[in-house]
Each structure stands twice: as C-alpha cells, then as structure tokens.
Amino acid sequence: MLTSEQIMGLLPHRYPFALVDRVVLHEPGQRAVAIKNVTLNEPQFQGHFPGRPLMPGVLIVEAMAQVGGLIVAQMPDLPKGLFVFAGIDAVRFRRPVVPGDQLTISCELLSLKRQRFGKVRGEARVEGQLVCSGELMFSLVD
C-alpha cells in the first residue's frame, strides 16, 4: 500500500490530473492495483454532461496509465525521466462511470524494451464489473 505522499513522489501528475487516490497493491516491475474515487466535484463534470455526468473515457484510460506508471516508477534499472503515452491498443468501454463510483484499476507490465519502451495491460472495474480494458504503450522522454 502507498500513501498519497508516496504516490505524489512517484507520479508527476497533480490536480486536476492526479487520478490515483490510493494504491492497494504495488509490485514494482510487475503489477499494481489502485483506487480512483469519482466525485461530482471534479471539473470535467461541469460539461460532461450537464444533467447526466459521465466520467470521460479518456480520463479512465489516463487513470490506467498512471497506475501503469507506478509499476515502472520504482524499477531500479530504469533511467530517471518522464514516461509518456506512446499508444493504446484494444481499449474497450463496457459501461459508464458516474460520480459516486469507485474505480479499481489493475495493471500489469507486459513488456519493457531497451529500458525506454513498455506496454501494460490495464483494467478498470466498478463494484467488480469491468468498465474499461486495454493495452497502453509508453516511452521515456529525455
């Protein structure tokens, strides 16, 4: 388990793009499971959509990417730097995510090449139901 201070020490994201509230499992270089509490106070709900707020799919994918970032953030052999999106594959959205939901995000490292390019498989669930899944690629920016 990681505290919020530890999460902030590992990820560069800050409000309003810090999308990991709590880490319940962290195995550097292998996998991580984290929680994102979805609240009506988040800025995206002002316009997505008035009267029927839905969490934008791109933010669910970003939350999965941040959990993936936690997997590589403490790997001792990797150079320090900023890992950014390099691509996404086979992302599917299964059901809407609304304020009041709690996303449980699981990611596992699939590959890491030349200490610069990697791929993770991610899933986001609400109350055990799959809401989003896909593969996310990242690369190290010097």
From Swiss-Prot:
Compartments (UniProt record): Cytoplasm
Protein name: 3-hydroxyacyl-[acyl-carrier-protein] dehydratase FabZ
Pfam families assigned: FabA
GO cellular component, one term: cytoplasm
Entries under InterPro entries matching the protein: FabA_FabZ, FabZ, HotDog_dom_sf
Keyword entries, A-Z: Cytoplasm, Lipid A biosynthesis, Lipid biosynthesis, Lipid metabolism, Lyase
Functional note: Involved in unsaturated fatty acids biosynthesis. Catalyzes the dehydration of short chain beta-hydroxyacyl-ACPs and long chain saturated and unsaturated beta-hydroxyacyl-ACPs.
Family: Belongs to the thioester dehydratase family. FabZ subfamily.
Positions of the catalytic residues: 48
Molecular function in Gene Ontology: (3R)-hydroxyacyl-[acyl-carrier-protein] dehydratase activity
EC number of the protein: 4.2.1.59
Gene3D superfamilies, sorted: Hotdog Thioesterase (3.10.129.10)
Catalytic activity: a (3R)-hydroxyacyl-[ACP] = a (2E)-enoyl-[ACP] + H2O
Source organism (scientific name): Prochlorococcus marinus (strain MIT 9313)
Biological process terms in GO annotation: fatty acid biosynthetic process; lipid A biosynthetic process
Class of the enzyme per the UniProt entry, highest EC level: lyase
